[in-house]
From Swiss-Prot:
Disulfide bonds join C75-C193, C163-C253. Lytic polysaccharide monooxygenase (LPMO) that depolymerizes crystalline and amorphous polysaccharides via the oxidation of scissile alpha- or beta-(1-4)-glycosidic bonds, yielding C1 or C4 oxidation products. Catalysis by LPMOs requires the reduction of the active-site copper from Cu(II) to Cu(I) by a reducing agent and H(2)O(2) or O(2) as a cosubstrate. This is AA9 family lytic polysaccharide monooxygenase F. One of its GO terms (molecular function) is monooxygenase activity. InterPro entries: AA9, AA9_LPMO. O2 binds at H179, Q188. One of its GO terms (cellular component) is extracellular region. It comes from Podospora anserina (strain S / ATCC MYA-4624 / DSM 980 / FGSC 10383). GO terms for biological process: cellulose catabolic process.
Length: 253
């Protein structure tokens, strides 16, 4: 998956993991049980023909992906296109609502965008094998934090670049949990994708594109990292070792 990488600068038990449950896009809150709500992995698979249409692509649950060379690192395991797009203006802010996230799962929050065909994202997929990979992906934001927080309905925001061309976009958003990343595999990737119809904007076609899989390597310092290792300073103080967020530079207009 090649992505426009705009890195947002903010940066145990399966029950302790999380996923994006809902969002506020274009001023609309995509709330529970509305037809355009985000995919619900513990409800949608059991609804048969009554399953609501979604703006986000399917995910298997709240567990992680650990293989950076797997197709699952694109939008999560078994992901398929969603039928709807959320309208949003270029330059506007999108707020994503995560489910419960444990404080112990510290790591970067990263957002990418990929331009879909002019007909939309609803029938477009990055592919089911490593080649071709998802094209035209750029990182739009990233920040280092402890994740959304340890509270219910935690929020993470990103801004749609104001200069990109209007059209349909697939947004890949993830948290990389580093609590077990001292050896590979160990880092836990929690990707999810939703679909936008971007209005306004400019005429910029970002060129700093990457692919998923392909953007991350197991040897990247941001993938294999000991979050608990400390470095001694000249003042006999111990500080956490520096962390480098994996992937390309953040795109700016």
């Amino acid at each position: 998956m090649k992505v426009l990488a705009t890195l947002l600068a903010s940066v145990g038990l399966v029950a302790a993991h999380g996923y994006v449950d809902n969002a506020t896009i274009g001023g609309q809150y995509y709330q529970m049980l509305t037809v355009s709500q985000f995919y619900q992995p513990y409800m949608d698979p059991y609804m048969g023909n009554n399953k609501p249409q979604r703006v986000s692509r399917s995910i298997p649950g709240n567990g992680p992906v650990e293989n950076v060379d797997s197709i699952d690192v694109q939008c999560n395991a078994g992901s398929v296109p969603a039928p709807l797009h959320a309208p949003a203006a270029a330059g506007s802010t999108v707020t994503l609502h995560w489910t419960l996230w444990p404080d112990s799962h510290m790591g970067p929050v990263i957002t990418y965008m990929a331009r879909c065909p002019d007909s939309g994202c609803q029938n477009w997929s990055p592919g089911t094998s490593y080649v071709p990979r998802c094209p035209n992906v750029v990182r739009i934001n990233a920040n280092l934090s402890k994740g959304p927080s340890g509270s219910k309905s935690s929020k993470v925001a990103y801004t749609i670049p104001s200069c990109i061309r209007p059209g349909y976009y697939l947004v890949r958003h993830e948290i990389i949990a580093l609590h077990a990343a001292w050896a590979y595999p160990g880092a836990q990737f929690y990707p999810g994708c939703h679909q936008l119809q971007v209005t306004g904007g400019g005429s910029t076609n970002p060129t700093n594109l990457v692919s998923f899989p392909g953007a991350y390597k197991s040897t990247d310092p941001g993938v294999t990292y000991d979050a608990y290792k400390e470095i001694e300073t000249d003042m006999d103080l111990s500080i956490a070792q520096a962390y480098t967020i994996p992937g390309p530079a953040v795109f700016t207009c």
